Swiss-Prot record:
Protein name stated in the entry: ATP synthase subunit alpha, chloroplastic
Catalysis performed (reactions): ATP + H2O + 4 H(+)(in) = ADP + phosphate + 5 H(+)(out)
Keyword hit for Aminoacyl-tRNA synthetase: no
Keyword flag Cell membrane: no
UniProt entry keywords in alphabetical sequence: ATP synthesis, ATP-binding, CF(1), Chloroplast, Hydrogen ion transport, Ion transport, Membrane, Nucleotide-binding, Plastid, Thylakoid, Translocase, Transport
Subunit architecture: F-type ATPases have 2 components, CF(1) - the catalytic core - and CF(0) - the membrane proton channel. CF(1) has five subunits: alpha(3), beta(3), gamma(1), delta(1), epsilon(1). CF(0) has four main subunits: a, b, b' and c.
Entry function: Produces ATP from ADP in the presence of a proton gradient across the membrane. The alpha chain is a regulatory subunit.
GO cellular component, one term: chloroplast thylakoid membrane
Location in or out of the cell: Plastid, Chloroplast thylakoid membrane
């Protein structure tokens, strides 16, 4: 009896010895030396990597940004109010990543891709790194497809292509966000995914944008990533990279995406705050030395992919705010040098009632007519030149008392052209409507119409063509060319409308 009991015990002991795992699990840990202002200094964490996520005892997560000889500087992804001096921290061995899926369409999320619209969790099956490398030279192809904004001034003279980075720059309250939201509204039915990233904006401004998109049915193809002004600097710093990761998910699935960063100057300010608190040496305007790299690595992820990768695209519209028109400040010049052109919005034009307040003279698209359909190239070719000559003449005419007839005619034509470029907010126009408008203006058909009546005449002409002569729209949409037949139909419609007007 005693022997069998002893055998059982020895068998159990033998089994336990066999099952014993001799592997030692090494955990990279450290101790909090100091915490405050969204920054923690950690002693230990000897093997931590730059950019690695670290986890505090009470659950807060941070990113190791400064690796110094005696300690590690960590930025907190939260308020960190429960972190105490002396508490333990462990390195996770991971870098920041977010879940991605089709389920994000129509949702409002924060910089960690967590929903903040109160509509429940988002089901996801895979994840992407927040910071992923930009496509290489071989992975890209040149921009050739237009991305229509619905704004005549942009689509005719400063065209944007799929895969381009076009900066929207101007003083505060000049309609920069309105240009971006109008572009989103114009993508309805284009099978294009839009991502709007709000960095350090007022919560009321973000709510207004979301409401506009919902009312117009644009939220179903849009994702809003929002970190408002009261968010920690770390989350404001991460928000644009999160937006880029979400857009990349669709781009690599052979889809077209549009991402709007509103705005990188607030992003740079959040990064400056983090850097100064981490005691990194300040440079120009107290920004750290790598603030150019901050934006270049973000905007270089924008691409038109090669046919081997499925020809997906990601187009970016960063919005930068200037102080009293000073485009030579640090952040504006940085972003101008990274992007493929800029749309300059002028406070003077805005106050003069010219909206969108686009200064066509100093706005430029470095992709140019490659991002226009043939029909638009045919009619819009001389529009920019005529407007430039008009602006020059107008400045001269202020000092001249008696002008000859030709100059007076050119001034009158210019005033009518400028009237054509005015558009109401949230009322984007189709390419066909834009072609009608530009052709009518540049071919002297409006010279006999009073300036105050120009917009009314054009609206009626567009409606007349849509209802009475639908063949015009069919020709443009099917051939993408302003054919002789289309021109004949348009001329006929203008004559008929002139008689009715």
């Amino acid at each position: 009896m005693v022997t069998s009991r002893a055998d059982e015990i020895s068998q159990i002991i033998r089994k336990r010895i066999e099952q014993y795992n001799t592997e030692v699990k090494i955990v990279n840990t450290g101790t909090v030396l100091q915490v405050g202002d969204g920054i923690a200094r950690i002693y230990g964490l000897d093997d931590v990597m730059a950019g690695e996520l670290v986890e505090f005892k009470e659950g807060t997560v941070g990113i190791a940004l400064n690796l110094e000889s005696k300690n590690v500087g960590v930025v907190l992804m939260g308020d960190g109010l429960m972190i105490q001096e002396g508490s333990s921290v462990k390195a996770t061995g991971r870098i920041a990543q977010i879940p991605v899926s089709e389920g994000y369409l129509g949702r409002v999320v924060n910089a960690l891709a967590k929903p903040i619209d109160g509509r429940g969790e988002i089901s996801t099956s895979e994840s992407r790194l927040i910071e992923s490398p930009a496509p290489g030279i071989i992975s890209r192809r040149s921009v050739y497809e237009p991305l229509q904004t619905g704004l005549i001034a942009i689509d005719s003279m400063i065209p944007i292509g799929r895969g381009q980075r076009e900066l929207i720059i101007g003083d505060r309250q000049t309609g920069k966000t309105a240009v971006a939201t109008d572009t989103i509204l114009n993508q309805q039915g284009q099978n294009l995914v839009c991502v709007y990233v709000a960095i350090g904006q007022k919560a009321s401004s973000v709510a207004q944008v979301v409401t506009t998109l919902q009312e117009r049915g644009a939220m179903e193809y849009t994702i809003v990533v929002a970190e408002t002004a009261d968010s920690p600097a770390t989350l404001q710093y991460l928000a644009p990279y999160t937006g880029a990761a979400l857009a990349e998910y669709f781009m690599y699935r052979e889809r077209h995406t549009l991402i709007i960063y509103d705005d990188p100057s607030k992003h740079a300010q959040a990064y400056r705050q983090m850097s100064l608190l981490l005691r990194r040496p300040p440079g120009r305007e107290a920004y750290p030395g790598d603030v150019f790299y901050l934006h270049s690595r973000l905007l270089e992820r924008v691409a038109k992919l090669s046919s081997q990768l499925g020809e997906g695209s990601m187009t970016a519209l960063p919005i930068v705010e200037t102080q009293s028109g000073d485009v030579s400040a640090y952040i504006p010049t940085n972003v101008i040098s990274i992007t493929d052109g800029q749309i300059f919005l002028s406070a003077d034009l805005f106050n003069a009632g010219i909206r969108p307040a686009i200064n066509v003279g100093i706005s430029v698209s470095r992709v140019g007519s490659a991002a226009q359909i043939k029909a638009m190239k045919q009619v819009a070719g001389k529009l920019k030149l005529e407007l430039a000559q008009f602006a020059e003449l107008e400045a001269f005419a202020q000092f001249a008392s008696d002008l000859d007839k030709a100059t007076q005619n050119q001034l009158a034509r210019g005033q009518r052209l400028r009237e054509l470029l005015k558009q109401s907010q949230s009322a984007p126009l189709t390419v066909e409507e834009q072609i009608i408008t530009i052709y009518t203006g540049t071919n002297s058909y409006l010279d006999s119409v009073e300036i105050a009546q120009v917009r009314k005449f054009i609206v009626e002409l567009r409606a007349y063509l849509k209802t009475k002569k639908p063949k015009f729209n069919e020709i443009i949409s099917s051939t993408k060319t302003f054919t002789g037949e289309a021109e004949a139909i348009l001329k006929e419609a203008i004559q008929e409308q002139m008689e009715l007007f």
